[in-house]
Amino acid sequence: MNQRPIQTATLSWNEQGTPVSEQFGDIYFSNEDGLEETHHVFLKGNGFPARFASHPQQSCIFAETGFGTGLNFLTLWRDFALFRQQSPNATLRRLHYISFEKYPLHVADLASAHARWPELASFAEQLRAQWPLPLAGCHRILLADGAITLDLWFGDVNTLLPTLDDSLNNQVDAWFLDGFAPAKNPDMWNEQLFNAMARMTRPGGTFSTFTAAGFVRRGLQQAGFNVTKVKGFGQKREMLTGTLPQQIHAPTAPWYHRPAATRCDDIAIIGGGIVSALTALALQRRGAVVTLYCADAQPAQGASGNRQGALYPLLNGKNDALETFFTSAFTFARRQYDQLLEQGIAFDHQWCGVSQLAFDDKSRGKIEKMLHTQWPVEFAEAMSREQLSELAGLDCAHDGIHYPAGGWLCPSDLTHALMMLAQQHGMTCHYQHELQRLKRIDNQWQLTFGQSQAAKHHATVILATGHRLPEWEQTHHLPLSAVRGQVSHIPTTPVLSQLQQVLCYDGYLTPVNPANQHHCIGASYQRGDIATDFRLTEQQENRERLLRCLPQVSWPQQVDVSDNQARCGVRCAIRDHLPMVGAVPDYAATLAQYQDLSRRIQHGGESEVNDIAVAPVWPELFMVGGLGSRGLCSAPLVAEILAAQMFGEPLPLDAKTLAALNPNRFWIKKLLKGRPVQTRSPATQESSR
């Protein structure tokens, strides 16, 4: 997903008070009654709200071209909320709304437009509270305690559609074919759009649109829809509705296939860290029944147990999968953490901003690359030494990049709070249960623990055991590394207490935590080392890195590590710095099935390519890991991705980025190039006991 700058909408307001797009010279909704127009064209045109009652699944998926002011979405949400209130026992429990918008509105313009419909005010306020920054790609927004999922894709719809993952194929129940009139926005209304709509629509799915233009009708028919002309809204004589009678088969990348779980009513999560807790909650939002097993006496005893951790995105200026993922992950994490705080979930934190310093030529070059993209200043901004120092409260000694929405939080506090919340929602927790063996027996997974503990059986299992992930037979070949890290806890001083934001250099230093009057400085990075003992050398190294990176100023001399307060954890790292999330791949079967994958793709006929089977995985076995040093940033989104995959839902990233998160990616990349796959990676050997 290319992080091209997203241009926001430029509006004017006509005499009727209707917003007008300066880009397209067209109104956003009817001058007569925008709300009634939405009901007539899009809801009634697709058979809603009456269709809610007969919908056979727990989730109903809508897609829209042109989010605009959000009027269609808000109207649908209001009608769905009324339906749920009147029919609490209905099968349908959740809405998933996917919308594409080339020119997103400023939140102030949204508020002005929403003011026309006081009956939608409570819904509109919730939307505006989570309105995302103008960043390219998908913004997943969770509303109504997870009953509403909104995927806002910012960018040109016809640029985005070819990048979408196979998880969107044959999924959409109803299309709101909106956007400005074909005469005003001719680039959108084309064959590519109509074909993509058909590919994404499930058999029996519908569409409606305000236009009755002949080329639109013919294009939709050629794509596979049955199209009907019906009475338009107000003075408009006709509009189009239609149904897709049969499934449209589309080309896929089966080697990166993401299977859903067969059963979500009996899921075991192995692990006691932040990603385990977030995954449990993401599954529970969808109705899953979850049991958690943790080797320790309480949660957050591993890498999630630190006092303070920095939250900021990982950028590299390459517009690649890594930058796409961490841009989405960071913004999603902030939205989710803010929602938790609003719900009264308490954890130490400060959204004080993060500054990444250009402390030498190498770091300066990296930051210059990061800034090649024209980021919104609310997301990332180049700053001089003077600007950074003013924000930080201390002389930063260098120029750098500032992340105003970043900050720090207490991973230990957060993990404990999330576990408590998941338990309140029905999760069963078993502590001091260290998994020894995982075996598939009679279509279930048998979990074997210590000698005095009975084996457990579950339909579906998620492994979230951090650096221990490669210990099991099924995950032994994954190229994961264990990396020891020691964080030093240093007492504040009158000078250090002036630090107002997180500083990142060849390490990091946090502002003082008011709860304990200490800062955190770290962290060491010892690859292949899983020991968690205190080490004086690493304590001193944490201090020395700060002194070495900021030699021009004297205040770092205030850092005192002599009381030897520290905490050591072990990260689970991957050489490409991206997490692994999805079904656990079957290593032996992958190599056997795909040994000639490159030849079949490059030289095989169409039928041979179409016959390539989906990637082999262990049945009902999933994983999330490899979060490295960025778990606070990545954990919320990878948990959401895994839960959505397991429930067979659309995923909130493009196909290229999702492929880069697939646990089989290293093997598949080599096989696609016709290169041999090593039996085991040295990185894996380092992390095994």
From Swiss-Prot:
Main location, first listed in the record: cytoplasm
GO CC terms in record: cytoplasm
UniProt keyword annotations, A-Z: Cytoplasm, FAD, Flavoprotein, Methyltransferase, Multifunctional enzyme, Oxidoreductase, S-adenosyl-L-methionine, Transferase, tRNA processing
UniProt catalytic activity: 5-aminomethyl-2-thiouridine(34) in tRNA + S-adenosyl-L-methionine = 5-methylaminomethyl-2-thiouridine(34) in tRNA + S-adenosyl-L-homocysteine + H(+)
InterPro entries in the cross-refs: FAD-dep_OxRdtase, FAD/NAD-bd_sf, MnmC-like_methylTransf, SAM-dependent_MTases_sf, tRNA_MAMT_biosynth_bifunc_MnmC, tRNA_MNMC2, tRNA_S-uridine_synth_MnmC_C
Any GO MF annotation of the entry: flavin adenine dinucleotide binding
tRNA (mnm(5)s(2)U34)-methyltransferase: annotated segments: 1-245
Annotated spans, FAD-dependent cmnm(5)s(2)U34 oxidoreductase: 270-689
GO BP terms, alphabetized: methylation; tRNA wobble uridine modification
Cofactor(s), names only, from the UniProt record: FAD
Reported function: Catalyzes the last two steps in the biosynthesis of 5-methylaminomethyl-2-thiouridine (mnm(5)s(2)U) at the wobble position (U34) in tRNA. Catalyzes the FAD-dependent demodification of cmnm(5)s(2)U34 to nm(5)s(2)U34, followed by the transfer of a methyl group from S-adenosyl-L-methionine to nm(5)s(2)U34, to form mnm(5)s(2)U34.
Similarity comment text for this entry: In the N-terminal section; belongs to the methyltransferase superfamily. tRNA (mnm(5)s(2)U34)-methyltransferase family. In the C-terminal section; belongs to the DAO family.
NCBIfam families named among the record's database cross-references: MnmC_Cterm, PRK01747.1-2, PRK01747.1-3, PRK01747.1-5, tRNA_MNMC2
Protein's name in the database: tRNA 5-methylaminomethyl-2-thiouridine biosynthesis bifunctional protein MnmC
